[in-house]
Design a protein with these regions (language model features):
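Phosphate/nucleotide-binding beta-alpha loop and adjacent structural elements of enzyme active sites
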Residues: 1-349
């Protein structure tokens, strides 16, 4: 049950989306607050849609943040995407674009110099002279939301020391996390993604971002041996694929943590969102190599691995890391994001 304060906040954010909803806004809002699974709306320019509750909530929140610095942007984007796309695809790109656009607005920094350019062919964002761009056919919408809108990797202590440092990104998907780290000053990112077509999307997005000198995409699995994966997995669903649960006819090489560390000069951060492989790294024979990093950001998946979060955190504590919860993604499943800081690195500095 929502508290009064939470309900007021959600209503305030939903008011921002009202300018996009031609019909059904109040009914959708009441359904959203009552936690109905689906709501029906007619969006300006786009048309009639049946939205999942989370999508209506995302539209409300993203519109709220985007209008802080560009009041007319949501309507402009809806109009642009409706010209050549069917309603569902237009809505998906609207959410993706608002995710990118809301990022600098949400940070509310007057020092940010921001340029936004969204079209059905290219989604691009430039902040303080650093740009990232995505092919709309090569994006996982939920991932963009998590990274740029919800701040899944927005750990101030990590970002404040990221400039000019190196990152290993395990579970890179379509390159969105790697490009997020570049946007925040990383010098080099090694991006590991096991699904071949998703890795190609990551390469495409890195190319569009003119970041091929900073991001190296590796189509491989974190493993001691080659792994079989699907050859053509739907990018829009790829965020939930796990090499521990799925397989396929395409063989991709295995890379070890040691291999990845040897690819960078300054292992500052390792990010792991690999649907279960984090347990293999933290409890496996190369676990001591994690000491090379100053920071770890990991997403846990006990429902896949059968390994409790407590066991993983205890292992990291033995390695000299202090771990704190950053985001609770699904409390029922124990799916959380943790930030772990090396205490030995802190004291040696």
């Amino acid at each position: 049950m929502l508290s009064l304060a939470e309900a007021k906040e959600k209503i305030l954010m939903a008011l921002s989306a009202r300018k996009l909803v031609e019909r059904g806004w109040l009914t959708a809002l009441l359904g959203y607050l009552a936690k109905r699974e689906e709501v029906e709306v007619r969006l300006k320019y786009i048309g009639d849609l049946r939205l999942q509750r989370k999508d209506f909530g995302a539209l409300a929140i993203l519109t709220y943040y985007a209008t802080m610095c560009q009041p007319g942007l949501p309507e402009e984007l809806a109009k642009t995407f409706s010209r050549s796309l069917e309603p569902r695809r237009a809505f998906s790109l609207l959410l993706a674009s608002l995710s990118l656009a809301s990022y600098p607005c949400r940070k509310q920094s007057t020092d940010n110099k921001v340029s936004i350019n969204m079209s059905p062919e290219r989604l691009s964002l430039e902040v303080n002279g650093v740009s990232v761009a995505f092919n709309p056919s090569c994006v996982y919408i939920d991932s963009l939301l998590e990274i740029f809108a919800w701040g899944e990797y927005e750990v101030p202590e990590v970002l404040s020391g990221l400039r000019g440092r190196d990152v290993i990104d395990v579970g890179a998907n379509a390159g969105d996390t790697a490009l997020y780290f570049i946007l925040n000053g990383a010098r080099k990112v090694i991006a590991v993604e096991p699904l071949p077509n998703v890795a190609r999307c990551a390469e495409e997005n890195v190319r569009l971002s003119s970041a091929t000198d900073k991001v190296k995409v590796i189509n491989a699995a974190l493993s001691y041996e080659p792994v079989g994966v699907p050859c053509d997995y739907d990018v829009r669903l790829s965020g939930s694929f796990s090499t521990l649960k799925g397989n396929g006819p395409c063989k991709v090489p295995g890379v070890t943590l040691g291999d990845l560390i040897n690819m960078v000069d300054d292992p500052y951060l390792i990010k792991m969102d690999c649907e279960g492989c984090e347990a293999q790294v933290i409890l496996g024979p190369e676990r001591e190599k994690l000491r090379a990093f100053e920071h770890i950001i990991l997403e846990t998946h006990p429902f896949i691995t059968g390994v409790s979060n407590e066991k993983l955190l205890a292992s990291l504590k033995e390695l000299g890391f202090e771990c704190r919860p950053h985001r609770a993604l699904d409390p029922k499943l124990g799916q959380n994001v943790y930030h772990c800081k090396s205490l030995s690195k802190e004291f040696s500095a």
